[in-house]
Amino acid sequence: MPKITIVGAGQAGLQLGLGLLGHGYDVTVVSNRTPEEIRNGKVTSSQCMFDSSLSHERALGIDYWTGDCPQVSQIALTVPAPPPAPAGTVAFSWAGNLTATAQSVDQRVKMPRWLEEIEARGGSVVIEDADVPALEKYAADSDLVIVAAGKGEIAGLFARDDAKSVFDKPQRALALTYVHGLAASEGPQGVKFNLIPGVGEYFVFPALTTSGPCHIMTLEGIPGGPMDNWSSVTSPAEHLAESKRIIETFVPWEWDRAKDCELTDDGGVLTGKFAPVVREPVATLPSGALVLGLADVVVLNDPITGQGSNNAAKCAATYLDSILAHGDAAFDRAFMEATFASYWSYASAVTAWTSAMLGAPPAHVLELLGAASQFQPIADRFANIFNNPPDAFDWFMDPGKASAYLAEVAGAAGTGAAGTDGAASADGAAG
């Protein structure tokens, strides 16, 4: 069987490696950290994964946490009313039901187990901070080298695809805060998504971390704005305090839940900024050898739509299918480009939807979001975009399709189509 080396031990790299091992391939995974170092390190993402992504884990028998991880069954959206409405006034707030539950497992829990599973299933693990000479070594010794490490020197080998990349600078200042003691919300567990126009976003959801069930606070501030003060934060305690300040100031309806929470651990914080980018899928090493990029290496989106780990799982599944279909043929440039093209046929929709969510919402989107507080089918369909982003293009992304869909839903409910006026006039604090 072909020998395949995967450089990078995250969601995509390990999922692909385990999938290949199940079909008898000779697999080596290169990780820059041992399982124990990952367990005891800092958090790396928020990774709320939806059913269509989790299905790939279930198919490989590697979803070990469903029984322990809190299940996410809803996505709720709250938008405050603009001035001159008093602070804390809500324009609209509603919750959409997922058709199947989602879950978030801290990668400090998941990746060590998967890395150990690589060896348990007959693969090899190399602990090395791989650089270009290391890639040359692996390329000389392997039939295919896949780069799944989304940062650092080797990710820089993959040229930016200007035609597919919308942004050239960060669109949000990002911060994650893993906490215990967040008060329970009313109703089913879910993602609470708060959109503060002109300022940023705050979303929070239940998860499983190294110390058990927790909540993850995700804060996304417009760069240079009032939610972008992380450069002055110098300790985990200050990080928690700044997270609370932002919540109390900009999402006061969430303050009662958050005011008494504490960090899960000192490693449960993360900040950063990056420019979303799409890169060329194939890199040429100095020797002329070719390597194939995977997941975040080739398509890196802002986390506003929570698609990072979901994209990684789906990219790994697509690459697995392509490799299996290729058999013993040479893994040449044509194979690599066709494999990425197959993934991009899906990921292009995710990228376009995510890019749209980063901008000011157009009138038809505001109309839909407002109407979702009156029509549950709209709220439910919006929630399930996170599981199936291409569906957004059938109703959410296009003004004409949005208008037709709204009329259809209103007609089925026996009412006239509602605009944003009635929804946006609702006031009071969100529960």
Role assignments for model-derived ranges:
Residues M1-A12:
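Beta1/beta-strand and adjacent pyrophosphate-binding region of the FAD-binding site
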Residues V7-A9, L18-K42:
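Glycine-rich FAD pyrophosphate-binding loop
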Residues R33, E37-P83:
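N-terminal FAD cofactor-binding segment of flavoenzymes
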Residues D63-V145, A149-A159:
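Conserved N-terminal helical subregion
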Residues F158-F193:
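Central beta-strand plus flanking loop segment that forms part of the substrate or channel wall
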Residues I196-V269:
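Conserved FAD/dinucleotide-binding core of flavoprotein oxidoreductases
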Residues T271-L294, V299, P303:
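FAD-binding beta-loop-beta segment adjacent to the flavin cofactor pocket
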Residues T305-G306, D321-G431:
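C-terminal helical "tail/cap" subdomain of flavin- and related membrane-associated enzymes
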